[in-house]
Design a protein with these regions (language model features):
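Nucleotide-sugar donor-binding and catalytic loop/hinge architecture
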Residues: 17-18, 95
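N-terminal signal peptide c-region/cleavage motif recognized by signal peptidases
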Residues: 12-14
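Flexible loop/hinge segments that line or gate small-molecule binding clefts
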Residues: 87, 92-104
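Positively charged n-region of N-terminal signal peptides that target proteins for export
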Residues: 1-5
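Small-residue packing motifs within transmembrane alpha-helices
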Residues: 7-10
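A short, structured surface patch at a secondary-structure boundary
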Residues: 20-92
């Protein structure tokens, strides 16, 4: 899992001139990003309890079942990390229609 996530992040980094802007909608995937020493790529996270120190300045995009889509879009992410159940199907479809890359 970590290897796949790293490959996705590296692919995005290679395809873009700047570092990819990543929003994580799954706390477990957020932890993996931190473990991979890539917390600086995170521009938004889903609140799910106490935050690691590495995320103190990263904006929230909502809570489970209460995704703030307007705030998420204002962060202009290149990639959104999520578990299939972390976002309601209607919101996931909306993100897909907007052309934001999703990894689940």
């Amino acid at each position: 899992m970590r290897g796949v996530l790293l490959l996705v992040l590296l692919a995005c980094a290679g395809a873009l001139a700047a570092a990819p802007r990543v929003v994580s909608l799954a706390p477990s995937l957020t932890e993996i990003v931190i473990e991979l020493q890539a917390a600086d790529l995170l521009v938004g996270v889903l609140d799910a309890g106490e935050r690691p120190a590495a995320l103190a300045q990263v904006p929230s995009v909502g809570r489970y079942g209460q995704l703030d889509l307007e705030r998420l879009l204002s962060l202009k992410p290149d990639l959104i990390l999520l578990w299939p159940a972390s976002v309601p199907p209607a919101q996931r479809a909306q993100l897909e229609r907007l052309g934001i890359a999703l990894y689940s």
